[in-house]
Amino acid sequence: MVKESDILVIGGGHAGIEASLIAAKMGARVHLITMLIDTIGLASCNPAIGGLGKGHLTKEVDVLGGAMGIITDNSGLQYRVLNASKGPAVRGTRAQIDMDTYRILARNLVLNTPNLSVSQEMTESLIVENGEIVGVTTNINNTYKAKKVIITTGTFLKGVVHIGEHQNQNGRFGENASNSLALNLRELGFKVERLKTGTCPRVAGNSIDFEGLEEHFGDTNPPYFSYKTKDFNPTQLSCFITYTNPITHQIIRDNFHRAPLFSGQIEGIGPRYCPSIEDKINRFSEKERHQLFLEPQTIHKSEYYINGLSTSLPLDVQEKVIHSIKGLENALITRYGYAIEYDFIQPTELTHTLETKKIKGLYLAGQINGTTGYEEAAAQGLMAGINAVLALKNQAPFILKRNEAYIGVLIDDLVTKGTNEPYRMFTSRAEYRLLLREDNTLFRLGEHAYRLGLMEEDFYKELKKDQQAIQENLKRLRECVLTPSKEVLKRLNELDENPINDKVDGVSLLARDSFNLEKMRSFFSFLAPLNERVLEQIKIECKYNIYIEKQHENIAKMDSMLKVSIPKDFVFKGIPGLSLEAVEKLEKFRPKSLFEASEISGITPANLDVLHLYIHLRKNS
């Protein structure tokens, strides 16, 4: 049977959900093909959304019309701001989720969205004509024709699950791997490599002895992800902290020879920042204990996820390891930990729209691009979906810059540098992180969302009013000069603020940590009518004024630099500071400008600085 749509999405994980929903929202006829409809939105690993860098991605996805934020706000069990005591640039919202509720909400949203249809089958091969995608075939002899195809297959491409010496061809425990499509992608000439990830054991909640374990609470004023969320007052559950110990470590060491990670059974490279417990014991042999979090998987507390205990050790060893840990001495394991190896395609095979360079109209998003994490997948799915629709409409692509969003950092890192290990987002990856805070996501991306038809006009108008109020009041504060007069000193004293000794402007005064929003309203009467969202932005802009200005200067400098032309006869070979790889690629593509050079995979900002210097030296000589 032959069926037609505008866009096909292959895979119903976090990338596939966002890709299909956003494309349908933008008016395309979308069909989602997934192996199991019941697992749409399943959190395969930890029961949490957000975190450092990841919370930023989730909020950016939300502002740009995505679903992850609002689903999380309606399925969370605990909400916290990580790094709350640090500056706003490195804070991250994180939520424990009820995995069942999240999955049900995601699935129902997909099944009830206009312009979006779903079928349960396995994609086996792509149909390509003259270098352009035209459709796919499935395992039940269906043929789907479409102008654009987005592949979001997660860990299912030639997936192999490892538990001890046992191996099974699964894309997730108990689910079939996608071997035919994996082979087809190799035959089409894509650069396919292997990665590995893993998951932790789960234990029955009623078998845990919580006595003596450290209780971990959510925030009193819980943060949320979606700007659409109102009257947020969720019921929150506690997590609990326990630790491994020398006995645990010895059990693991005694069984290194049975660990797939060390026996040569696993070849794929695992996530650097989420290592297995056996890897941690091996690499950090001097540590006497490792922290573990017991996290409820649902509101019923029937199962707990042991965060920090990712493992692929044999079943009997997992039993011994868990029973050596305080609180888990009599724990009943409901699901064992395992490792999974899978195919991914080097993301340098993609453009910044996530379209493949090799096949027109084919987009890749999520773990197939070498990333790890629900949030990274959702961000890519969203951007692939948006760009597929824009391409259908013959409109300009939507590409976020590194100075606009963490999504921009994520995609730029992937397509220019590639990856040889599962890529995870951190705030440290963003050179302009002071401008890319969670708190200003709406102001950074609201204009884009409205232009793309992904934000309601009434809300957008309110947002523009807020932006105008921020700029007008910052200008007023800069012009407001305070002297150490008797009246000023008295008012400062009433607010328990230290006196001023010289002239200062309003911005300098509000840069004080102690000058909270309440004091701002009290001291400067013109700030009193402003809403909290506006006041918060004014406070942050005042506190980090010098650094924010410096980052804006750096952006302007970079934008100016990228406009620099590269002479036709410019010789790249022999320039100190350029790697052999950079020279080879520059000689091959012969970019006409530094901007064109920046679009070449493998060309780094440091390479661009070197080129700029030597172009300048040549002109002057």
Curated annotation (Swiss-Prot):
Main location, first listed in the record: cytoplasm
Molecular-function GO term, any one: flavin adenine dinucleotide binding
Cofactor(s) the record lists: FAD
Keywords assigned: Cytoplasm, FAD, Flavoprotein, NAD, tRNA processing
Keyword Ligase assigned: no
Protein's cellular compartments: Cytoplasm
Residues that coordinate or bind FAD: 11-16
Residues that hold NAD(+) according to the record: 270-284
Pfam families: GIDA, GIDA_C_1st, SAM_GIDA_C
Keyword Flavoprotein recorded: yes
A biological process from GO: tRNA methylation
One cellular component term from this protein's GO annotations in UniProt: cytosol
Subunit note: Homodimer. Heterotetramer of two MnmE and two MnmG subunits.
Function: NAD-binding protein involved in the addition of a carboxymethylaminomethyl (cmnm) group at the wobble position (U34) of certain tRNAs, forming tRNA-cmnm(5)s(2)U34.
Family that this chain belongs to: Belongs to the MnmG family.
The protein, known as: tRNA uridine 5-carboxymethylaminomethyl modification enzyme MnmG
Species: Helicobacter pylori (strain P12)
Protein's gene: mnmG
